[in-house]
Curated annotation (Swiss-Prot):
It holds the Pfam family 2-oxogl_dehyd_N. Keywords: Glycolysis, Oxidoreductase, Thiamine pyrophosphate. This is 2-oxoglutarate dehydrogenase E1 component. The gene is sucA. Signal peptide: none annotated. The lineage of its organism: Bacteria, Pseudomonadati, Pseudomonadota, Gammaproteobacteria, Pasteurellales. E1 component of the 2-oxoglutarate dehydrogenase (OGDH) complex which catalyzes the decarboxylation of 2-oxoglutarate, the first step in the conversion of 2-oxoglutarate to succinyl-CoA and CO(2). The keyword Transport does not apply.
């Protein structure tokens, strides 16, 4: 019994059973798929299994076989001679696993040796914790390649090797990764650290050169522009060699396009020392010089693009523009990368790389980080892995106590939600940093998943250069004042190892300073980029009133209409979906007028026919929140989906429709990044309800409404925002139209409220066909999707155009009109139906379909027949303090006679967008319609 117990203990703690049963199962399944994918020792063991063992069999017989294999003392397996030896081997394997699990906690990660990065003592990493004594250090154990590819090893040697591997300048967190192949790769990569030397003398000198550049620029700026904000990189200087090593190594692995996003910390250093921005241009920005007509932005928000030479090829680099709102640029970068990958047909995600740079407080504190990570492995948003770097200077403005900044051990613990490995690395060790860079690139390229690099460093100055950090961090900054710079630490190391002399180190710094004095580029790898890859110049200075070709061939239209209504006979659609498609067939056959869903579908179909690409995403975008779109037909037999818009013809544009993750902020930011990268794709984001779009308010305020004015970034993104008062309460009624109008100026974006299917058709086509790329805010309907009056004829689509204003449609004699009511959106139909019910002939109703840019001439033309009228009303469903009234009243008044006072008909001012009771809603709706029509 004692013998069996020893074996049971051993099996419970090794890879051959017990607590590690999942390990053996996954390893065995890998072997069944490809015997060469497992180590030779495992392969021999699996080869010895009974031939009847098969993948579809229960795993219990396999585990039982291993238990029997161990007891029968087979040569291929780890064997135990006696209970004492077996018990010791258990402890050895537990000791090894302790380092793999928890070695990072004792790693030498903090350059200051000040905070929690170095836990004082982790008991499991001491051999004595596992019951060994000093006398056991010379004992040799048979570990059968379990670590370091060794058959046998002395305990003392093993302890030293594990400490050097897992407790040096790199701390790897990877045991939360569940995929066995990834885990084994990370483990093997980490345990190869002992195979020295890792870098040549030439590479090491280059690391110092890059540290010298990082240090030299900050010193130069500090002396030349004292007190000016630059958000210095000092203390985290290793970020520059880290970035350049990632670029170099990824290029050698096939990447030819790198898109980066980062906040303000170290951004100027990045611009000059990685992307190759001319120092003299940066100095001009410090001096306040500017030549652009745009309002511009501060220097540490600016983006940049360049080409970077690696060996005999070039890598295109892009640093995204971004605001001070931390972390929001990350999903923008991911969207830009996805757009490039799609354009290049990079289905393997091997040509374009995303790198996002975070701060330690922000990566743990900003919710958009979680939202972006959640998208990372989804079909519609994945880019095949992102390298995420945290510049961890252990302080957020004035807050440095981890107990205040987060509730986790590390700031990077958020990475574990997607099982991303985390490489913690000491910022004072550039060689460890370079190793982390290469490891991250190789992992991402091999497994197409995110990986984090936690660059643990410090901030030499305050949050900005005018800030005094000693006031709030006296202890930390007393250490920083005495601590040598990363450049000094590494230079001393190279000199002591005979790689360089003191004179060479000094000469290197002098040469860099001289280059700055001359204003020359300091990045030898910089190359002038090819600007012909994507032509944006054709979209500059376009007049939004200029005409465009809106007509479409009737024959071609009907052919496309037939195809968008077809799906395979073998596909069994849901009965309601089948009816919708049958109704659409009747529409193109002229038996029915077109509804909203058909008109929208035909907008996409006709654009695709002309070679335009279309990307539509949002929560429930495939079906449509209100069951109107059905761009994807789901087979009721097997759950597969069919997208008719992807089956028009061989030369059509690309159509994508994605049901998004349940997030507004990250998804809208992603689509903004996508749209700013590809002007030839009609990019659309649809809110589930317009009410929920304010979950992405940062994106709307900082990017969509102001990106062109601040940074010159054109964007043709469409936002579809379902809006309308139908008694559904304050959370399902309003897209907050007033907020978009309040953001409008300098023709920065368009705000449209289409009221007919033909209007949405032409609005979407116009957005793509005009040579203008500015955001379109489309206030889309809900109840109008099926309203019997909200229909259009085939002719209105084929031969019509977008109307910024729609005049009176009933046969009223203008001379009989005593009041003109102007309105937008769904309320028009409430007014029309009530007027018809009243048999009124003295009130004309004018629809303004585009609220911004306001179509002054078109409105005046629509009002011309009523020049004699002195009673004008603006009617809206929204409360007085919301909707278009306050923001557009001056525009409405400019279109009517000066002597006339414009009246208001609508809900009274309200703190809430809408009431929650249907009875009260109905009463209010009836009252505002009555106010508009009665006089």
């Amino acid at each position: 019994m004692q013998q069996n117990k020893a074996f049971d203990d051993w099996l419970a703690s090794t890879a051959l059973g017990g607590a590690n049963q999942s390990y053996i199962e996954e390893l065995y399944e890998s072997y069944l798929s490809d015997p060469q994918s497992v180590e030779e020792s495992w392969r021999k063991t699996f080869d010895s299994l009974p031939k009847t063992t098969a993948l579809e069999q229960p795993h219990t017989p396999v585990r039982d076989y291993f238990r029997r294999l161990a007891r029968e003392n087979h040569n291929e397996a780890v064997t135990v001679i006696d209970p004492a030896a077996g018990a010791k081997l258990v402890k050895v394997l537990q000791f090894i696993n302790a380092y793999r699990f928890r070695g990072h906690l004792e790693a030498n990660l903090d350059p200051l040796n000040y905070y929690r990065w170095k836990v004082s003592f982790v008991p499991e990493l001491d051999y004595r914790h596992h019951g060994f004594t000093e006398q056991d250090l010379n004992e040799t154990f048979n570990i059968n390649h379990y670590v370091y590819k060794r058959d046998t090893i002395k305990l003392g040697e093993l302890a030293q090797m594990l400490k050097e591997t897992y407790c040096g300048s790199i701390g790897l967190e990877f045991m939360h990764v569940q995929d066995m192949e990834q885990k084994m790769w990370l483990q093997s990569k980490m345990e190869s650290l002992l195979d020295k030397p890792l870098f040549t003398s030439e590479e090491r000198v280059n690391f110092l050169r890059e540290l010298t550049a990082a240090d030299g620029l900050e010193r130069y700026l500090g002396a030349k522009f004292p007190g000016a904000k630059r958000f210095s990189l000092e203390g985290s200087d290793a970020f520059i060699p880290l970035m350049k090593e990632i670029i170099r190594h990824s290029s050698r692995q096939g990447v030819n396009d790198v898109v980066m996003g980062m906040a303000h910390r170290g951004r100027l250093n990045m611009l000059v020392n990685v992307l190759g921005k001319k120092p003299e241009n940066l100095f001009d920005e410090f001096a306040g010089k500017h030549s652009s007509e745009r309002t511009g932005d501060v220097k540490y928000h600016q983006g940049f693009s360049s080409d970077f030479a690696v060996d005999d090829k070039r890598v295109h680099l892009t640093l995204a523009f971004n605001p001070s709102h931390l972390e929001i640029v990350s999903p923008v970068v991911i969207g830009s990368v996805r757009s490039r990958q799609t354009r290049m047909n990079d289905t393997e995600h091997s040509k374009v790389l995303a790198i996002t740079v975070h701060g330690d407080s922000a990566v743990a504190g900003q919710g958009v980080v979680q939202e972006t990570l959640n998208m990372s492995n989804t079909r519609g948003y994945s880019v095949g892995g992102t390298i995420r770097i945290v510049i961890n200077n252990q302080i957020g403005f004035t807050t440095s106590n981890p107990n205040d900044t987060r509730s986790t051990e590390y700031c990077t613990d958020i990475a574990k939600m997607i099982q991303a490995p985390i490489i913690h690395v000491n910022g004072d060790d550039p060689e460890a940093v370079a190793f982390a860079a290469r490891m991250a690139v190789e992992y991402r390229n091999l497994f197409k998943r995110d990986i984090f690099i936690d660059l643990i460093s410090y901030r030499r100055h305050g949050h900005n250069e005018a800030d005094e950090p000693l006031a709030t961090q006296p202890m930390m900054y007393s250490i920083i004042k005495k601590h040598p710079t990363p450049r000094k630490v590494y230079a001393d190391r190279l000199v002591s190892e005979g790689v360089m002399t003191e004179e060479q180190v000094t000469e290197m710094a002098n040469d860099y300073r001289d280059a700055l004095d001359n204003g020359d580029r300091v990045v030898s790898e910089w190359r002038e980029m090819d600007t012909a890859k994507m032509d944006w110049l054709q979209y500059l200075n376009y007049d939004w009133t200029a005409p465009y070709e809106s007509k479409f061939s009737q024959e071609r239209f009907l052919t496309l209409a037939k195809r968008v209504c077809e799906y395979p006979e073998s596909l069994r659609a849901h009965p309601r979906v089948e009816k919708i498609y049958n109704d659409r067939k009747a529409m193109y056959q002229g038996e029915k007028l077109l509804d909203w869903g058909m008109a929208e579908t035909m907008a996409y179909a006709t654009l695709l026919d002309e070679g335009v690409n279309v990307r539509l995403s949002g929560e429930d975008a495939g079906r449509g929140t209100f069951f109107h779109r059905h761009a994807v037909v789901h087979n009721q037999n097997d759950g597969t989906g069919y997208v008719p818009l992807t089956h028009l013809h061989a030369n059509q544009g690309r159509f994508e429709v994605w049901d998004s993750v349940l997030s507004e902020e990250s998804v809208l930011a992603f689509e903004y990044g996508y749209a700013t990268t590809d002007p030839k794709t009609l990019t659309i984001w649809e809110a589930q309800f317009g009410d929920f779009a304010n979950g992405a308010q940062i994106v709307i305020d900082q990017f969509i409404s102001s990106g062109e004015q601040k940074w010159g970034r054109m964007c043709g993104l469409v936002m579809l925002l379902p809006h309308g008062y139908e008694g559904q309460g304050p959370e399902h009624s309003s897209a907050r139209l007033e907020r978009y109008l309040q953001l409008c100026a300098e023709q920065n974006m368009q705000v449209c409220v289409p009221s007919t299917p033909a209007q949405v058709y032409h609005m979407l086509r116009r957005q793509s066909l005009r040579k203008m790329r500015r955001p379109l805010i489309a206030i889309s309907p809900k109840s109008l999707l099926r309203h019997p009056l909200a229909v259009s004829s085939l002719d209105e689509l084929i031969n019509g155009t977008f109307q910024t204003v729609i005049g009176e449609i009933d046969e009223l004699d203008p001379k009989d009109v005593k009041r003109v009511v102007m309105c937008s959106g769904k309320v028009y139909y409430d007014l029309l139906e009530q007027r018809r019910a009243n048999n009124q002939k003295d009130v004309a109703i004018i629809r303004i379909e585009q609220l911004y840019p306001f179509p002054h001439e078109d409105v005046k033309k629509a009002l011309e027949p009523y020049a004699h009228v002195t009673d004008y009303v603006w009617c809206q469903e929204e409360p007085l303090n919301q909707g278009a009234w306050y923001c557009s009243k001056h525009n409405f008044e400019s279109a009517i006679p000066e002597s006339v006072k414009l009246k208001y008909a609508g809900r009274p001012a309200s703190a809430s967008p809408a009431v929650g009771y249907m009875s009260l809603h109905t009463k209010q709706q009836k009252q505002l319609v009555e106010d508009a029509l009665s006089f």
